[in-house]
Swiss-Prot record:
The protein's name: Uncharacterized protein HWLF2
GO cellular component labels: membrane
Pfam families linked to this entry: Bax1-I
Membrane topology of the entry: Multi-pass membrane protein
Organism listed in the record: Human cytomegalovirus (strain AD169) (HHV-5)
Family affiliation: Belongs to the cytomegalovirus US12 family.
Length: 239
């Protein structure tokens, strides 16, 4: 077998291990969700509407970062560019989470992106010098402005669905491109950043699938109405 064939097999096995890791984490997450659904079904249903709003903010950041990535083809392959990509996503999700007062989602996302930052820095601590690109500053500014504009001018459900579809298309395209790069084009110096980029794309793809889970927006309102009615009726019952 030629050296090129051996490298192809090694990269295919590496990709397979990444997908196995993703599936194991997804199964663990689904098991936890199923357990919570059985133990606290009403509490979980009340959280669906807030989770959907936060994931919509995440999709907006993915759309902006995807456009920035296509504008600069080498965007995700460099360690510092990838680190900036991760930090931009963290800023976008954190800002949107504070906008809707979803503190638990903020903490979870910050913990995830912090892990990616430490992995990237630890792997390429002595990387070669990298030229800073103006497109990063432009993309960061555009991301902040777009987040503000969309949620100020278009709060309806229609814009939420459009953003979700666009974000899903960007994620699927990114997964396909990253897979092809790891199999064929990526250099060994950028192998781990490329794998981390693929891992992030798959994580966002799984999060976007959770977005399409059916929810009952009126469940929280119904529960609050029931609690208020019970509290109002309690003094009359006692008297």
């Amino acid at each position: 077998m030629s050296l090129r064939g051996q490298v192809q097999i090694a990269r295919s096995v590496f990709l397979l291990r990444i997908y196995i890791l993703i599936w194991v984490q997804c199964l663990i997450l689904m098991s936890v969700c199923a357990f919570c659904w059985l133990v606290l079904p009403h509490r979980l249903e009340q959280l669906f509407s807030s989770v959907r709003l936060t994931l919509s903010c995440l999709m907006i950041s993915i759309v902006c970062l995807g456009l920035l990535r296509w504008a600069e083809p080498n965007f995700p392959k460099n360690v510092w560019i990838l680190l900036t990509y991760t930090l931009l996503t963290s800023v976008a999700v954190t800002a949107s989470g504070f906008h809707f007062s979803h503190r638990s989602v903020i903490y979870a996302m910050v913990a995830t992106v912090t892990l990616f930052c430490f992995l990237t820095l630890a792997t390429y601590l002595f990387a070669r010098d990298v030229e800073l690109q103006r497109s990063l500053l432009t993309g960061a500014s555009t991301l902040i402005l777009l987040l503000f504009a969309v949620f100020s001018l278009f709060p309806e459900a229609v814009s939420e669905i459009l953003v979700m579809i666009a974000g899903l298309a960007v994620i699927v395209t990114s997964v396909v491109c990253d897979t092809q790069d790891i199999l064929h084009d990526i250099e060994y110096e950028s192998y781990i950043p490329g794998a981390l980029c693929l891992y992030m794309d798959l994580m966002y793809l799984f999060v976007s699938v959770l977005y399409f889970m059916p929810s009952e927006p009126g469940s929280a309102h119904t529960a609050q109405t029931t609690v208020a009615a019970t509290a109002a009726a309690s003094p009359q019952f006692v008297s």
